[in-house]
């Protein structure tokens, strides 16, 4: 009976979380990203502890510096690269369009090319305006992400000490449920660190081999954005394709696309099934479907909460429906 009541409490917290995610997507997404970031810092610190024994706090400090510098480097370089390369792309499009005007081509084809060029320009301008409009929200979210990343360990300790308020009928059972769920999520993020390293190295070396500028930045960006399931490749694709096009023209678009597709397929068919699916003991296709469903329901935030939601749901079913 006590476990049954805990089941209701757990379900209530899940519903409350989803409602808040729908009503306040920026805040909840920022909190989840802060949680991701905290776990990443923990894993990097554990790795550094193998080589740095004393002082004990040093690996944690270095881990914080490395992770935040990586994110800052990617973020600071992202928009300047986009703006600079967009100008080159527009110039190239104008040059091609001017060249086509001197060629005797059918009127309908000329009209189509002009429409494509105009649509591309309008779409780019609209995207820039949307990004500018979201800047205040992005700043708030960034501050919240950093704060969350630093206080997660304190929050874990606080929840552990006050779990009897969350599950008053059977605190030990509730504590076991929360611990199992968080540990599995922690293992998943740890696995994602390995996947992201492989993807970042693949993209960075691919760009270097094909002489695409800013190969180091592209590799770092691919590493950072890989923590956004399935959408990260889209984010890293924008500067990669722009840089490839500005240097190699249309053949550069083909080269950039091949690098991105190869990295995506490597992750989807080799790395994710071996590392992530085995970590969660859930088939990768179920993970993909869950990401797509919650992404459709909660937009970008849904992509990030999909994995915590799936882990919570799996443990809820195992512990409270099937009886452990």
Curated annotation (Swiss-Prot):
UniProt membrane topology term: Multi-pass membrane protein
Main location per the UniProt record: membrane
Transmembrane regions listed in the UniProt entry: 12-32, 62-82, 105-125, 131-151, 190-210, 227-247, 252-272, 285-305
Gene Ontology terms: biological process: transmembrane transport
GO cellular component: plasma membrane
InterPro entries xref list: AI-2E-like (IPR002549)
Location in the cell: Cell membrane
Family in the record: Belongs to the autoinducer-2 exporter (AI-2E) (TC 2.A.86) family.
Protein name listed in UniProt: Putative transport protein TM_1187
């Amino acid at each position: 009976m006590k476990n049954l009541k805990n089941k209701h409490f757990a379900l209530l917290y899940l519903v409350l979380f989803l409602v808040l995610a729908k009503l306040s997507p920026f805040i909840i997404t920022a909190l989840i990203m802060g949680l991701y970031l905290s776990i990443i810092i923990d894993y990097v610190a554990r790795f550094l502890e193998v080589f740095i024994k004393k002082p004990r706090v040093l690996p944690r400090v270095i881990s914080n510096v490395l992770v935040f510098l990586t994110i800052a480097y990617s973020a600071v370089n992202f928009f300047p690269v986009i703006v600079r390369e967009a100008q080159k792309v527009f110039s190239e499009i104008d040059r091609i369009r001017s060249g086509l005007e001197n060629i005797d081509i059918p009127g309908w084809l000329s009209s189509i090319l002009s429409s494509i060029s105009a649509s591309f320009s309008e779409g780019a301008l609209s995207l820039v305006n949307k990004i500018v409009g979201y800047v205040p929200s992005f700043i708030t979210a960034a501050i919240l992400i950093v704060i969350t990343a630093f206080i997660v360990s304190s929050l874990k300790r606080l929840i552990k000490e006050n779990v009897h308020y969350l599950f008053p009928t059977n605190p030990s059972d509730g504590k076991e449920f929360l611990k199992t769920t968080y540990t599995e999520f922690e293992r998943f993020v740890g696995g994602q660190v390995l996947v992201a390293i492989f993807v970042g190295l693949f993209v960075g070396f691919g760009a270097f081999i094909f002489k695409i500028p800013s190969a180091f930045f592209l590799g770092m960006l691919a590493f950072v954005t890989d923590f956004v399931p399935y959408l990260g490749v889209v984010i890293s694709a924008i500067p990669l394709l722009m840089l490839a096009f500005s240097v190699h023209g249309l053949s550069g678009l083909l080269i950039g696309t091949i690098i991105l597709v190869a990295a995506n397929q490597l992750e989807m068919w080799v790395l994710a099934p071996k590392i992530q699916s085995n970590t969660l003991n859930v088939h990768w296709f179920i993970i993909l479907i869950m990401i797509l469903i919650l992404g459709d329901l909660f937009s970008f935030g849904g992509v990030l909460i999909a994995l915590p939601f799936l882990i919570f749901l799996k443990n809820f079913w195992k512990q409270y429906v099937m009886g452990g």
